[in-house]
């Protein structure tokens, strides 16, 4: 019979609540050089929190996608393979046996393994330190499983962070999650110069003396770039010096699946409309410094997303911080950030309305400058130093309220158990029928003639319960009920 011994418990680790001692914080998410928005966010957040208090010691647990092999910096102390369930358990052990006092998780359904990224729950459940979770996506109509995952995150974490008021409202209406554990901290942006030499930056990009329209971000079909291209003929007929830059590489997942089909379609659309010479693709992944220069060179930033279901946009926040005049479709985050004449909105997919907005701004330098001034003044509150301070304040209050917690499930699940490969119950299932576990087998074939005995079924029940605690599955739960 298979026997799962109860290993020794991990030693208890005292948790200091003093903020005079080092505060090791583990940041979990994708990380540079991986090319995705959350990777950039994790880099910036870790640096901002470390800068906010001299005793903060950041470390990173980087989530790696199946196709990725990255040369991470020394900040990364542990690598979690996205689809390896065992890696999440090992990562929790690493944290529990380290000096980490708090974990900050960057949550997006698609970056973690399991159904809708459910493996992250295994990681959080096994931790013995407080956890704060930042939600990068909050859906209006989540699937039952997506809603359940966020509800479990809420139950298991000390604080759930969202980046906008609309995200907080959606948590309440679509997930049933509300209360003081939900905190709003905006998306951070770099500190940028108030009055850059815009013409010098334009000269660097070969467009000195021209009006620069800009969109940036990883390219994919949901970005709505075709709406802007279709608006160009009406605009360039009156302002022939205008050029539209589309800055950013094609999203890696899209590139693997479709290649450059979307970019090719956009180029053909521009050719057909006779505006190809007014369109320039900068199809590479840009550094933070290059991005700053592009944004500060731009006169108008266009965010033409096709769907309202966008509770946060780092690109939109960055553009406002650079002092660009922002024109956007009315997705949720844009409605919130651009209220109070901090930008201009136009309907989804409506290139005619967009052309009117662009003509108004290009034809009125006073209005254009007023929009830029309002955006820049508002964005000051989202600068990374302020966001780092806000996160540190939350970390400090969390540590004071809950310096240590007990891992859920089996008390302090040991390293030996969770480091095992995924448990296979095939033989035990084969040895079990509607009555219980059969007493003997010939090699792997159940010997039904030998019947059943109470002590074997009692031991089988113990094994099934322990298996369900260590690596829960429908099979282990079925065996518990059977025995």
What are these language model-derived features?
Residues 27, 207-223, 229-232, 245-247:
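Conserved donor-binding/catalytic core segment of Leloir-type glycosyltransferases
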Residues 158, 278-284, 293-310, 324:
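Acidic donor-binding loop of glycosyltransferase active sites
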Residues 166, 188, 250:
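Carbohydrate-associated surface elements
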Residues 194-207, 212:
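A short helix/loop element that forms part of the nucleotide-sugar donor recognition site in Leloir-type
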Residues 257-285, 289, 435:
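Nucleotide-activated donor-binding/catalytic signature segment of Leloir-type glycosyltransferases, i.e.
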Residues 340, 344-351, 360-365:
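Conserved acidic donor-binding segment of nucleotide-sugar-dependent glycosyltransferases
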Residues 408-459, 463, 470, 474-483:
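Low-complexity, Ser/Thr/Pro/Gly-enriched N-terminal "stalk/linker" regions
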């Amino acid at each position: 019979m298979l026997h799962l011994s109860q290993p020794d418990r991990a030693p208890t680790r005292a948790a200091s609540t003093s903020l005079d001692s080092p505060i090791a914080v583990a940041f979990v998410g994708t990380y540079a050089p991986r090319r995705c928005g959350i990777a950039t966010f994790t880099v910036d957040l870790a640096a901002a929190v470390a800068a906010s208090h001299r005793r903060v010691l950041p470390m990173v647990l980087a989530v790696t996608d199946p196709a990725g092999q990255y040369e991470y910096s020394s900040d990364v102390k542990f690598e979690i393979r996205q689809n390896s369930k065992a890696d999440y358990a090992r990562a929790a052990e690493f944290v529990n046996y380290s000096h980490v006092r708090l974990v900050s998780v960057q949550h997006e359904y698609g970056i973690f393994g399991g159904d809708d990224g459910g493996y992250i729950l295994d990681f959080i459940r096994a931790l013995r330190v407080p956890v704060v979770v930042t939600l990068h996506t909050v859906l209006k109509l989540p699937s039952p499983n997506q809603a359940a995952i966020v509800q479990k995150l809420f139950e298991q974490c000390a604080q759930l962070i969202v980046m906008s008021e609309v995200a907080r409202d959606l948590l309440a209406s679509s997930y049933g999650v509300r209360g003081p554990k939900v905190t709003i901290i905006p998306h951070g942006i770099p500190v940028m110069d108030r009055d850059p030499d815009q013409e010098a930056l334009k000269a660097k990009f070969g467009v000195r003396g021209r009006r620069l329209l800009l969109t940036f971000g990883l390219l994919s079909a949901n970005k709505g770039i075709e709406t802007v291209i279709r608006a160009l003929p009406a605009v360039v007929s009156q302002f022939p010096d205008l050029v539209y830059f589309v800055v950013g590489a094609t999203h890696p997942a899209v590139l693997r699946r479709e290649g450059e089909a979307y970019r090719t379609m956009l180029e053909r659309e521009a050719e057909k409309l006779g505006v190809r010479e007014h369109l320039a693709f900068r199809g590479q992944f840009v550094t933070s410094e290059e991005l700053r220069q592009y944004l500060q060179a731009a006169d108008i930033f266009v965010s033409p997303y096709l769907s309202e279901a966008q509770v946060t946009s780092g690109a939109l926040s960055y553009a406002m911080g650079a002092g660009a005049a922002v024109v956007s479709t009315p997705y949720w985050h844009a409605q919130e950030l651009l209220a109070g004449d901090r930008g201009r909105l136009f309907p989804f997919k409506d290139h005619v309305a967009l052309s009117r907005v662009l003509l108004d701004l290009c034809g009125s330098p006073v209005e254009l400058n007023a929009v830029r001034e309002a955006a820049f003044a508002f964005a000051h509150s989202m600068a990374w130093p302020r966001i780092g301070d806000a996160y540190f304040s939350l970390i400090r209050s969390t540590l004071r309220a809950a310096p240590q917690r007990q891992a859920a499930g089996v008390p302090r699940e040991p390293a030996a158990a969770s480091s095992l490969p995924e448990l296979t119950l095939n033989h035990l299932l084969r040895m079990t029928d509607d009555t219980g576990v059969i007493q003997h087998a010939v090699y792997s074939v159940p010997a039904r003639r030998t019947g059943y005995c109470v002590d074997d079924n009692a031991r089988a029940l113990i094994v099934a319960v322990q298996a369900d605690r260590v690596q829960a599955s429908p099979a282990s739960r079925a065996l518990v009920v059977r025995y």
